[in-house]
Amino acid sequence: IKYMTDGMLLREGMTDPLLERYGVILLDEAHERTVATDILMGLLKEVEKQRSDLKLVVMSATLDAGKFQHYFDNAPLMTVPGRTHPVEIFYTPEPERDYLEAAIRTVVQIHMCEEVEGDVLLFLTGQEEIEEACKRIKREVDNLGPEVGDLKTIPLYSTLPPAMQQRIFEHAPPNKANGAIGRKVVVSTNIAETSLTIDGVVFVIDPGFAKQKVYNPRIRVESLLVSPISKASAQQRVGRAGRTRPGKCFRLYTEKAYDSEMQDNTYPEILRSNLGTVVLQLKKLGIDDLVHFDFMDPPAPETLMRALELLNYLGALDDSGDLTRLGSMMAEFPLDPQLAKMVIASTDYSCSNEILSVTAMLSVPQCFLRPNEAKKLADEAKMRFAHIDGDHLTLLNVYHAFKQNNEDPQWCYDNFIQYRSLKSADSVRQQLARIMDRFALQRTSTNFNSKDYYL
């Protein structure tokens, strides 16, 4: 059995179009509809026509089964009953004007009024919101007086250091002598929807929002916007409350909003992304007729045209829309097309080692930490790495300092640097260097003391 990401399987398809080495392929969490999953489903549908021995299993806890069955030519459906406990769902009678305020109020009410022991999981949209909520919840509970049980607030988001993320598995504070219940409240982004299970959670608070990537093809900008979640995501959140015993879910929106305003499933990523990488991968896979490629949800023609224009401008496609030698090399790099072109072109400017480091740093989460309790110290530490010519050279300074200090986690801690991001960047850099070596692209650096260095 081989476990891999959908992106890895897609890369294998570039060298082995029929995926001959596999007899059974399972696509899990298909409801998330990532770009790689959507392309894979289109490819595997074609592969199945040529390989009668291949078995394809598409799995999900909250799948729009009918749509997937129809896409795969009325494939059979197998349902496995879940073993979750019953969860009582509550809605607000009126729409909430300020979901953050309502969420904090709900946490405090649960802690004060619920007579059942159990922890609380609150979903919010991002780091700033989560830190603000943790601070305000703690302040409000501390002001309630000694007769109320202790409440431990724990933030959870992807850029949090691993040691801090492990806090979600800590036990709740003990009950007081007067019987007041001690609880913990985990305030998380939507990574707690499917990625992990937190034992002890009985109460879930769902404001109904998450950050989603949105792409505007006209101005060619991707941004993260706070958007309403889908019914599928809402059901995933409900399921978090019934993992170990019966629970309650407090939805901070009306039942009418759930029934008539929410989409059934999350808007597929392929419909809200820059398709430059997608088009490059499909061209590398030998698929030239992009308009008729069997996407489950075809992207807008304008988005496809913008991607083709970009790749032509970068030299990855010729004027006929065919893949060039440069484009074929770019497709091998697991990067956005602009970054892939930059890495390949860096050999002509004798700076490929530096560009590898910058590209690796751009490919991992934010490396600068700025904890609430030490913002001034963190800003001062960041300024020590700052470069007058901008963020890219600032990131290069951080990477160089990390290597010069022997990748020391303590050095990262002292300088408010995210150790995990730097280790990831180091791995990405090694991977990119191996791809460069495969294409015999020379890795060079200009001597810092050379008079040509700043030309």
From Swiss-Prot:
It catalyses: ATP + H2O = ADP + phosphate + H(+). Keywords: ATP-binding, Helicase, Hydrolase, mRNA processing, mRNA splicing, Nucleotide-binding, Nucleus. Pfam families: HA2_C, HA2_N, Helicase_C. SMART domains: HA2, HELICc. It comes from the Eukaryota. One of its GO terms (molecular function) is helicase activity. Residues 1-81 form the Helicase ATP-binding domain. InterPro entries: DNA/RNA_helicase_DEAH_CS, HA2_WH, Helicase-assoc_dom, Helicase_ATP-bd, Helicase_C-like, P-loop_NTPase. It is found in: Nucleus. PROSITE patterns: DEAH_ATP_HELICASE (PS00690), HELICASE_ATP_BIND_1 (PS51192), HELICASE_CTER (PS51194). Residues 106-286 form the Helicase C-terminal domain. A motif (DEAH box) lies at residues 28-31. The keyword Cytoplasm does not apply. Its EC number is 3.6.4.13. The keyword Plastid does not apply. GO terms for biological process: mRNA processing; RNA splicing. Its main location: nucleus. GO terms for cellular component: spliceosomal complex. Belongs to the DEAD box helicase family. DEAH subfamily. DDX15/PRP43 sub-subfamily. Pre-mRNA processing factor involved in disassembly of spliceosomes after the release of mature mRNA. This is Putative pre-mRNA-splicing factor ATP-dependent RNA helicase PRP1. The lineage of its organism: Eukaryota, Metazoa, Echinodermata, Eleutherozoa, Echinozoa. The gene is PRP1.
